[in-house]
Amino acid sequence: MSGYERLKSREVSRLCHFTKLQNLTHILATEDGIIASGSIQQDTKNVNDIARYDGELDYVCCTIEYPNSWFLNSAIRSDIDKIFKDWVVLCIDLDVLLVRSAKFCECNASKAHGQFIQSDFENVDQIFADRVSSFQWPRTPKMLPCCPTNGQAEVLVKDNIPRQFITGIIVGNFDIAERVYAMQKFYGISKIPICIAPDVLSTSWSGMIKQGNRPQEQQYLWPEEVEL
């Protein structure tokens, strides 16, 4: 069974990648989508590109089902940009793993400078074990089967994630949702669903999924679809 098939068997519906709202313009502008840090121009990099302690500059870091909100919060605190302060989470179709090679890590890939990263993606189900060596807390009995034992576990996707595999954009409030909508209209791309889910951008989701629950994700209604 391939790593892709193992994730599908656990009903994993998506990968997640967070980025600054201002970066979304670069991502939506071309079919290349999300580009690995090593290929990004220096002037468009931000804190989560620069601080790549895992050394995997040719890979795009993603998490499974929900974002690494702990690292996201750290990135927000470390960000010296006082003008462009908003972040979003991109939802990635699992089918990207059919066209891109990948590695995985049972924890944050930067832990111990990447020592926990594994190249044999067929063994990705290890991240769902009752216990993983790099994480002190065991898996809870009610935990959603699609979520890894350590919420910071990662899938590293080679080179880039083409725009066609971005299936959703999660934001923290209505104001950001409207700006994301405006970006999509400006670039004239097919509608990518937008969800408002503050619990997903915080670490609140972690406690929920350990009890078998999901945080609420409210669909943003495109203005032209709202009945007057």
State what each model feature region is:
Residues 1-61, 67-228:
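Active-site-proximal loop/hinge segments that shape catalytic or ion-binding/gating pockets
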